[in-house]
Amino acid sequence: MRICLNNAFGVDTSSIFDDEKNVICKNFKDKEKMRRAGCTAATILDRLCAFVRPGMNTHEIDEEGGSMMRDFGVKSACKGYRSGNRIFPSFTCLSVNDEVVHGIGLTDRVLQEGDVLSVDVCIRENGVIGDNCRTIPVGVVSSEVDRLLRITEESLYVGLREALHKKRVGDV
């Protein structure tokens, strides 16, 4: 199912899809709830990234993320997520180095100086989901890793500037 956010960002997206039968147009109240959930997730993400230090295990970081969610009065959209007979056990998704995405917080996964950590915070607030992710250096990283992180972030913003009304993913 696709969601059409008419004027959510000041852009009319009402005709973005050729097939309108699967489009749910959100009203202003729904869009504000989505924006608030995104902002809450972003705030938790900022604080959780600042918490990360070499020598911590990913379970500690995940537990801190769960604690922050409780402090904000929101729930994790990850923990307890069901896919078939599998249930996701963590509050956050924490992926180290070459792990792709949706890593689980583990007590035996200890962060080392120079690692790279992707932190994904996905929350439920007022019936909607806010989801933010960031990849950060753990302590001091090599110049190659620092360059990779910098260029990757710059590329994200270049892509966002090109993600315009009626453009296809291949155009971006």
Predicted regions: what is each one?
Residues 1-172:
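Active-site neighborhoods and metal-handling regions in enzymes and metal-associated proteins
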